[in-house]
Amino acid sequence: MEKVDIFKDIAERTGGDIYLGVVGAVRTGKSTFIKKFMELVVLPNISNEADRARAQDELPQSAAGKTIMTTEPKFVPNQAMSVHVSDGLDVNIRLVDCVGYTVPGAKGYEDENGPRMINTPWYEEPIPFHEAAEIGTRKVIQEHSTIGVVITTDGTIGDIARSDYIEAEERVIEELKEVGKPFIMVINSVRPYHPETEAMRQDLSEKYDIPVLAMSVESMRESDVLSVLREALYEFPVLEVNVNLPSWVMVLKENHWLRESYQESVKETVKDIKRLRDVDRVVGQFSEFEFIESAGLAGIELGQGVAEIDLYAPDHLYDQILKEVVGVEIRGRDHLLELMQDFAHAKTEYDQVSDALKMVKQTGYGIAAPALADMSLDEPEIIRQGSRFGVRLKAVAPSIHMIKVDVESEFAPIIGTEKQSEELVRYLMQDFEDDPLSIWNSDIFGRSLSSIVREGIQAKLSLMPENARYKLKETLERIINEGSGGLIAIIL
């Protein structure tokens, strides 16, 4: 990631204000980190000579040894400085140097009268050194910073052992996690690439679940500063996660089992994403679902906090769903093409009557208007009205009329006594409440109730004579073509 991109993305997430709160134990190199940060990326980008000189004068002092150098919180520079990164990109940068948490072996937080009292921007009266460290850390991160940087050490930069830093380090991390701002940790070491330092870096990263970088703060380069900002950027919260399902899954109905399974997997997995850093880990979890072959990170907008994930389904699942939807097993491309031709023909026929079907279900009567292809035009005929002539054009088109008729079917077996009849009713109704459709599968005299009822309905439908059907059709034609609304029916 380029330098400009890093600053641009962080500026978007912080509203253009890059305020780094540098916290940690005493004698870890916090002031040195701030000084190098300013010298490498801030001072060279300040165009105004006077502002650059003022910022240079405000750099903190640092020195080796056990004596504490920073005895009060300090803003560097005192007022946020506008830094020109590139065309159209100006950011406000300020760092805050905190009073560190005390550690055994450090000198300067006590004097001959006991705990050293220091001045802070938050209280009018001086407060003890250790209290200023606790209050300052929380206030700096919560009120004066957009990003937190914890500086710790492996003990190689001075005369204080690594073990003396652990308690203060844990307290700082605990404070920062309570505040909830994005932060990272830097291990200040004179041997940042040593296997022991690398092992320590990995241990701390797992212990605190944060990114940890190892570097020599004293010899820090611009690339190291950008690495800190880049890692901090991935600690910002995710604002939106877009998950793209396979395109063919998206065309399934909302209540289809596979689409619901995909949606449930997304809900279950995405809920673990809190930070931008979590996205990569969560992408791998999608592969645990049997209906997801793989998942990939399609893109991530660091400045917007938006991540996009693509999900891919196995090929055999497509074949399975196709068989389920079509109703037959697809034997090959030729078979699929044959089916598509049949379905296309069926759809064309259905489209002509679909509106009529909806109408007949709602009102009991439906009309399917004829298509242009169904219309036939008679030969034009010249007509005369008095002294004037005209042309008669006559077209004939078949319209389909649907009538919903409720057919009654009754089955009343005489089986014996009243008690036997009650037992039959009880047998028929035993599963009705749990599954109303189960009554049709009830066995009566060796046959299912559904087959008995269906047979009765079919018998009634076949009773309508041919001449009655013809007369009904003829009657409808006269009503429609002659516009007569009156109808008298005599059923014999």
UniProtKB/Swiss-Prot annotation:
Q: Which GO terms describe its cellular component?
A: cytoplasm; endospore cortex; endospore-forming forespore; spore wall
Q: Which GO terms describe its molecular function?
A: ATP binding; ATP hydrolysis activity
Q: Where is the motif (Walker A motif)? A: 24-31
| Effect in UniProt of substituting residue 400 to P | Altered cortex and coat formation, affects localization to the forespore
Effect noted on mutating residue 210 to A: Defective in germination
Impact of altering residue 393 to P? Altered cortex and coat formation. Possesses swirls of coat in the mother cell cytoplasm and does not possess a cortex
Q: How is it modified after translation?
A: Seems to be cleaved by the YabG protease.
Keyword terms of this UniProt record = ATP-binding, Cytoplasm, Hydrolase, Nucleotide-binding, Sporulation
- Which locations, inside or outside the cell, does it occupy? Cytoplasm
Outcome recorded upon mutating residue 189 to K? Unable to sporulate
Known outcome of mutating residue 71 to A: Does not abrogate sporulation. 5-log decrease in sporulation efficiency; no ATPase activity, but no change in ATP-binding ability; unable to polymerize and fails to promote coat assembly
Q: Which reaction does it catalyse?
A: ATP + H2O = ADP + phosphate + H(+)
Q: Which SUPFAM superfamilies match?
A: P-loop containing nucleoside triphosphate hydrolases
Q: What happens when the gene is disrupted?
A: Forespores lack a well-defined cortex, and the coat is present as swirls in the mother cell compartment of the sporangia rather than having been deposited around the forespore protoplasts. According to PubMed:18691972, unable to sporulate.
Q: What is the effect of changing residue 30 to E?
A: Mislocalized to the mother cell cytosol. Misassembles the spore coat. Mislocalizes CotE but not SpoVM. Does not multimerize. Almost complete block in spore formation
Gene Ontology terms describing biological process:
peptidoglycan metabolic process; protein complex oligomerization; protein polymerization; spore germination; spore wall assembly; spore wall biogenesis; sporulation; sporulation resulting in formation of a cellular spore
Protein role: ATPase. Has a role at an early stage in the morphogenesis of the spore coat outer layers. Its ATP hydrolysis is required for proper assembly of the spore coat. Forms a basement layer around the outside surface of the forespore and self-assembles irreversibly into higher order structures by binding and hydrolyzing ATP thus creating a durable and stable platform upon which thereafter morphogenesis of the coat can take place. Required for proper localization of spore coat protein CotE and sporulation-specific proteins including SpoVM.
Q: What is known of its domains?
A: Extreme C-terminal region (AA 487-492) is required for its proper localization into a spherical shell around the developing forespore. N-terminus (AA 1-64) is functionally important although largely dispensable for proper localization.
What's the protein here called? Stage IV sporulation protein A
